[in-house]
A protein has these predicted regions:
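Phosphate-facing sequence motifs and polybasic nucleic-acid/acidic-lipid-binding regions
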Residues: 1-206
Length: 206
């Protein structure tokens, strides 16, 4: 049949042509803030969000050798949720936040869901977006800070014997909600000791 194993075709994220310069500048800015504010490694957090597909399709199939366009069953599955993962520079993994499409708690995992109790004990946060998407919103980002990021920073400051005024550094990507004036203004007013730092656009995977 002249078939061979082929990977489904899809557009890859484009890396900026000046990515090295962007990353170097980001590194210098971060190093400066860490030095000037005496930020210890436990008080530096990196957070990232990613899509988790409920029923992941296969990326490989059999197709005619030399095919330019290859389709697979389930590869375009859109039913998914967002998971926000945070880790500190000293290796501490913070509780996860998940965001589910919908307007009520029924959109989130139920009490009888597999491993639900373990997730709750680990302080996971199950959020519904109150929108028709499962991406982060102003409200879910504020919950992330109020319930996960800020409490972690405050606990670590106490453990390290540092004053409440000690600055901490939080690195996130350039998602539109993250960089919005609304969120930045809220964070500065509500959590003035948390400094925000952005991963250059298109460089998250580097």
């Amino acid at each position: 049949l002249h078939w061979s194993e082929r990977r489904a075709t899809r557009a890859a994220q484009k890396t900026p042509t000046n990515w090295e310069d962007l990353c170097e500048r980001a590194f210098i800015r971060m190093a400066y803030r860490i030095k000037e504010e005496d930020v210890p490694s436990p008080l530096y957090i990196n957070s990232d969000q990613t899509q988790v597909v409920y029923a992941q399709g296969a990326a490989l199939t059999w197709s005619k050798t030399g095919s330019k366009q290859v389709s697979t069953v389930g590869n375009d599955e859109k039913r998914a949720f967002t998971i926000v993962v945070s880790i500190s520079c000293d290796g501490t993994v913070l509780p996860f936040q998940t965001i589910h499409q919908g307007y009520t708690k029924k959109s989130c995992p139920t009490l009888t869901s597999q491993s639900y109790d373990q997730c709750i004990k680990a302080n996971f946060r199950f959020e519904y977006s109150k929108t028709q998407t499962y991406w982060s919103t102003q409200e879910t980002m504020r919950t992330l800070v109020d319930e996960i990021i800020a409490p972690y920073f405050e606990t670590k400051k106490q453990e390290l014997g540092l004053p409440p005024t000690q600055k901490s550094l939080w690195q996130i990507d350039l998602w539109s909600v993250h960089r919005s004036d609304e969120f930045r203004t809220w964070l500065k007013k509500t959590h003035p000791t948390i400094m925000i730092d952005y991963v250059p656009g298109g460089c998250t995977g580097l």
